[in-house]
Amino acid sequence: MTKVQELKKHLRPGQVYRREDVARWSNAVDRHLKQLVEEGTLTKLAGGLYAYPKETVFGKAPPEDDKLVEAFLKDDRFLLASPNAYNGLGVGTTQLYDKTVVYNHKRHGDFQLGGRRFAFRVKPSFPKSLTKEFLLVDLVNNVDQLAESKQEVLARVAERAASCDFRRLEYATRNYGNVQTKKFFANALKPGAELNAD
């Protein structure tokens, strides 16, 4: 059995590996990685990042975003979000965006991983999963980056906020909102207040 065949025993379809992960099982890691990429066992996603794609009836499946991001960050504390999620809130957003936002504690910047765009944003805190309240707060945090009319979206967010669980929305605003967002929701939850995120 060759060293490359021994190395393959440690690899699992659907997983993403960093160069140092593979180095544990290889004495010539760069040569072995090059061989595995050339024969199609591994796919190079970015510098030092490789995927072992799952075979499906449609061909090779790309790695799941959470596995890809976890390997890239070397950390499992992150939240995958997308501006597309705002569309499900019923606040008048309809645009489709081709990037995924990754809230995390380590990296900041835009990265291309496996042919997909990820916008990494360092945040001091974020929830473990997306909630309606977090999405409303996140939308107001990022309202200037959206293609829709800011005032129309904010008016609908205020209407939607009135129907949310007050405690959960207050918690999300306090923990995840920027200063303007906190002011906006403080006003939005008061009856008859003018709504403005400026």
PLM segments and residue spans:
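Short beta-edge/loop segments at beta->alpha junctions of small alpha/beta modules
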Residues: 1-74
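Short gly/ser-rich loop at a beta-strand->alpha-helix junction or flexible surface loop bordering the NTP-binding
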Residues: 44-54, 68-114
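A short, charged helix-loop
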Residues: 114-122
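Hydrophobic alpha-helical interaction segments
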Residues: 123-198
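Basic Lys/Arg-rich amphipathic helical interaction modules
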Residues: 6-9, 113, 170
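Charged, low-complexity, helix/coiled-coil-prone segments
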Residues: 22-34, 72-84, 95-100, 123-132, ...
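Alpha-helix initiation and N-capping motif
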Residues: 1-4, 30, 65-66, 82, ...
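Short coil/loop linkers at secondary-structure junctions
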Residues: 28-29, 92, 177-179
